[in-house]
Amino acid sequence: NRPDPQIIWDKTNNPIWNTWDGYYHRSTKGGGYWEFKKKLPEYWTIKYRDLTFKVSPTNFKHTGIFPEQATNWDYITEKIKSCQEKEIRILNLFAYTGCATMVASHAGADEVVHVDASKGMVDWAKENMKLSHLENNKIRFIVDDVIKFLEKEKRRGRTYHGIIMDPPSYGRGPNKEVWRLE
């Protein structure tokens, strides 16, 4: 019983799978809930290099961080640190809780624009900014549908030196716009 539709490999009988601390139960109607062997705090923090991120299990299975993105965060850091531009502007679309936003800002981007359709995720990203002591860095937080935001930026003539995108396969914008990656 594995709730992720992306799991394509056969289940193994490795005894380590019986030592879980938290188990996510997916609902057939969407969402779900976590089951924990022992009581956990509502949230906790983890460190990634010099940054601190909030972790909190959600009813849609996520925890606020995708650790498998660390390789991409290292790449972002390397590219920003080696960039010869004077004013480095980075655009992070579908920015979620802002781990890549914080990485780009900490690496030296002069401005990072963080765009996500979910106000709750943008608020979480602001918490990650504070936890990582980046309040004095120029980070713009935008709650908007990504396509609508990009259309506005095009009309404004705004350009960026780098664009970070990790779109979901399906999602809804702040005004119920549907996003489907096909």
Could you tell me what each predicted segment is?
Residues N1-I65, D74:
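Non-catalytic substrate-recognition/targeting regions of SAM-dependent transferases
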Residues P67-K86:
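Conserved alpha-helix/loop element of class I SAM-dependent methyltransferases that forms part
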Residues E85-Y96:
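Conserved class I S-adenosyl-L-methionine
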Residues T97-D110:
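Conserved SAM-binding loop of SAM-dependent methyltransferases across substrates and taxa
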Residues E111-D116:
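Conserved SAM-binding motif I beta-strand of class I
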Residues A117-I164:
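S-adenosyl-L-methionine
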Residues P167-P168:
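Switch II (G3) loop of P-loop NTPases
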Residues V178-E182:
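Glycine-rich S-adenosyl-L-methionine
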